[in-house]
Amino acid sequence: MNNNSKIRSKKIVHFVKFVFHISNIILIIFYLYPGSIFGCFIYNDCGIQPQLTRDFASNMISSNHVYVFIIISFLGFVGYSKKTTFKYITTYLFFISVFLELMHFAIPERGFETKDLAGNIVGVVVSLIIFLIFKPRKKNGFI
């Protein structure tokens, strides 16, 4: 890899990290808001949650949560793919997927749902599998 490619690669990784951090802030705001921000804008009713597709596994896994956590997790895995940070980002993503859903016990107009928690975790796992399958490798493992 020549010097220009390394610089370009570093810039891309920095951009992905930036998008990951901004996405996390937005996720936390949307998750902790008492009601549905999307429902407020789309339906003019904060009590209605828009549904992208039907839920998975006979309504046991929230499709919206799977999609969101696939995207955010993939950004995290790409941005923090170095061997030293990969364990931390993986732990963080599983932690945040559980923690944010548990916070719904304490937020008015929100409620803990097992299918949402399952969707969060499935999203992280699917993203991790996709990342590990397609990740470029060096001789000694991670980049």
Question: What is the role of each PLM region?
Answer:
Residues N2-P108, F112-K115, I121, V125-I143:
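Bulky hydrophobic segments
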